[in-house]
Amino acid sequence: MRKKPVVIGVAGGSGSGKTTVTKAIYEHFQGHSILMLEQDFYYKDQSHLPFEERLKTNYDHPLAFDNDLLIEHIHKLLNYEPIDKPVYDYTLHTRSNEVIRVEPKDVIILEGILVLEDERLRNLMDIKVYVDTDADIRIIRRLLRDIKERGRTLESVIEQYVNVVRPMHNQFIEPTKRYADIIIPEGGHNHVAIDLMVTKIQTILEQNSIL
């Protein structure tokens, strides 16, 4: 009988290095059966709201995410069933009509700022990871990313950080660190921690007779 896939949850604040960590794990197991599932794709559909209301969306609050759909999709993947992953349109601030077909794999990496906040999600994880990076490093990374990649102004990024990102991080994201099995300081630059994670994943896969 085929064992269930391994689920790794990777959480941490915006700009902490979550994506760098998940990519490092993904690249290590490239050639094996592995997929990345980003929580950002699972923001709630807001097509029923006027555009002006959508502009007020707080993307750093737990209620912004459609965790019910995410959990449903993880259950399907655990049963080796394909899913149609939603696509979020940040220009319209709602879910796109497009979907991405995702085939089941033996390793599922679930990455997002609040993947450890929902107990139902945590209960599906074999390994829970929190990427812990100093606030000044996180804001610098966010500034560079949003200005360069998203065409934001310096003033708008700082205003959002002060009024939304920082308070939401302190209220909802940082407290989820206590649920982590592994805390990775310095994000993706902590090669020792990443190597330990890879070793743990390999052990679970071997126990599941997948490797």
From Swiss-Prot:
Pathway membership: Pyrimidine metabolism; CTP biosynthesis via salvage pathway; CTP from cytidine: step 1/3; Pyrimidine metabolism; UMP biosynthesis via salvage pathway; UMP from uridine: step 1/1
KW Signal (keyword) present: no
Q: Which domain of life is it from?
A: Bacteria
Q: From which source organism is this entry?
A: Anoxybacillus flavithermus (strain DSM 21510 / WK1)
Q: Where does ATP bind?
A: 12-19
Which Gene3D superfamilies does the record match to this protein? P-loop containing nucleotide triphosphate hydrolases (3.40.50.300)
Q: Which InterPro entries match?
A: P-loop_NTPase (IPR027417), PRK/URK (IPR006083), Uridine_kinase (IPR026008), Uridine_kinase-like (IPR000764)
What is the enzyme's class at the highest EC level?
transferase
A GO BP entry? CTP salvage
Main location per the UniProt record = cytoplasm
Q: Where in the cell is it found?
A: Cytoplasm
Q: What is its EC number?
A: 2.7.1.48
Q: Which family does it belong to?
A: Belongs to the uridine kinase family.
Name of the protein in question:
Uridine kinase
Q: Where are the transmembrane segments?
A: none
Q: Which CDD domains match?
A: UMPK (cd02023)
Q: Name one GO cellular component term.
A: cytoplasm
Pfam families this protein is in?
PRK
Q: Which residues pair up as cystines?
A: none
Report the catalytic activity: uridine + ATP = UMP + ADP + H(+); cytidine + ATP = CMP + ADP + H(+)
Keyword annotations for this protein, in alphabetical order, are: ATP-binding, Cytoplasm, Kinase, Nucleotide-binding, Transferase
- Offer an example of a GO molecular function term for this protein: ATP binding
- Would the keyword Transferase turn up in this protein's UniProt record? yes
Its taxonomic path starts at:
Bacteria, Bacillati, Bacillota, Bacilli, Bacillales
